[in-house]
């Protein structure tokens, strides 16, 4: 009865995963996860397979042939290819890695409001910034604000390495890397090989959490930065199996620190208050 009364609503209404409810309520689930799934299949619980968070599969891509790199890549991307990223990591194995991407709403291309996502790879912690358009000037504006609020030293510590794709919105890496105050290089931007999104697979997988709240086809037109911070806070408060059932917030707080976490717009949400549905934007 307790499972149907407490656990099932968390899964069907707030989109909690099986791992999330097992991490948050072990006292109510005296069985293995495989048994829990079996109970669902047998119809013992008031939850159906369609209510479960989807599992995402990724294909392994073949290695990129750098000898075929387009001439235009040899400008801004010289020294920033994925192989350069790998070389940098060999010499800086403990560097903080941030994966960067964009998520669009109903309007594709550069035509409307979208999200800039920044994911701290070691912790699966995702920052979400609202862009009015998917253009490099607006990406630059986000990073100028981050440098201003965090300060150059803290920005450099947190964003030591940034790995992203070949989208035109990321075509001005120096504006991301360089301090607007001193001209000093604070970060290093690298690019994935073409058609190799798996090289920043952590952020690709984390985007599924955004889609639980804002399914594909949902307009971002009415989404404010405050809304994006709320979305990020709920996502980052969701326990992850890969983090030994810690949430990204719990895993990252020791490294990022409370002050910087606040400046990044992320707050901790209690386990049972985590809601991965659009209702969180109507509160």
Where on the chain are the PLM-derived regions?
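Secondary-structure boundary/capping micro-motif
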Residues: 1-205, 209-219, 223-224, 230-233, ...
